[in-house]
Amino acid sequence: MAALTDADCLVVKIGSALLVDRDAGGLRQAWLASLAQDVAWLTRQGVKVVLVSSGSIALGRGILKLSDTDLPLEQAQAAAAVGQIRLARAYEEVLAPHGITTGQVLMTLDDSSNRRRYLNSRATLKQLLSMGVVPIVNENDTIATDEIRFGDNDRLAAQIAVTVGADQLVLLSDVDGFYSANPNIDPTAQRFDEIGEITPEIEDMAGDACSGLSKGGMKTKLMAAKIATAAGCRMAITEGVVLNPLRALNEGAAATWFRADTDPQAARKGWIAAMKPKGTVHLDSGALAALRSGKSLLPAGVSHITGHFQRGDPVAIADGAGHTVGHGLVRYTAEEAGRIMGRKSNEIESVLGYPARAALIHRDDMALTIQNGD
């Protein structure tokens, strides 16, 4: 078991069935207040926390007095629009007394599959966390359609964990872990304390969702575990219905942990290094020295650009002799990079005509093959 207090960044997924009283259609206020206590406790330990919360459609359904059956797309989107305001306010009200500022972030599948938007969402989330803000993330159900939606917040939570480089992900569920069979119908079902590899046999054990409010079942949780662990993030499934569920997990409550065999930073750098570059950014000796010391690549250190690339595309990074020294995800198009190369960061806006980021390639989006002293 991993201690939550050991995490640098923790992502917590909260399902509709935990947050919303199915019969009354309102929030489970006492439970939400206890969750806020847990978040405050973790932030005091120096842990950065991101909450991925369902509940907007379930809340809006109750406010609009819609049926509790599957809703047509238009009604679901209307319910999300109404419920999202209530959901954001609820988190603000329970966390503010602990001195915690919240920020709302709405995502769609496009925001992770499109590299440019992925980099933008990553930068925003990282900035919020650096300022001590607890982001409240939800799928943007008001505009998402079947073609551009995650479909469940288990996978969204895993993608957010990858995006922010979290080292732990907790899925608060209506069961206390992953079982060999459905424990509600099979008395011989056994819970796994830890799973090191998601094999075909493990996948065959997963069932489907049975809750009237939640869309996520064990199959989606396994998908989330694959996404998270491949990026170096450990993941836990634990029962969330109890009060103070995060503190309970930290103190040894029943759960299933999915092991990650690498750390988030190493996994991300391996992912970047494996991409086929769309172009090359050539550096001067000063920029090369800066990269060796762990700095981001600024336009001032670029001598010339080759290839055709868009924002978010992978590029090779080369020294003055043309030798590849790394790879990175670039924050500018080839045309923009050509205009600002050799320029100081405070000149970028005047050259491009609009505000822009200081780094051409941020150090978090870079995988180098050189080391200090090379």
From Swiss-Prot:
Function as written in the Swiss-Prot or TrEMBL entry: Catalyzes the transfer of a phosphate group to glutamate to form L-glutamate 5-phosphate.
PROSITE patterns on file: GLUTAMATE_5_KINASE (PS00902), PUA (PS50890)
Enzyme Commission code(s) on record: 2.7.2.11
Binding site for substrate: S54, D141, N153
Enzyme's top EC category: transferase
Name of the molecule in the record: Glutamate 5-kinase
Protein family per UniProt: Belongs to the glutamate 5-kinase family.
Main localisation: cytoplasm
Residue numbers binding ATP: K13, S173, D174
HAMAP family: ProB (MF_00456)
Protein species of origin: Roseobacter denitrificans (strain ATCC 33942 / OCh 114)
Database matches in CDD domains: AAK_G5K_ProB, PUA_G5K
Location of the protein in the cell: Cytoplasm
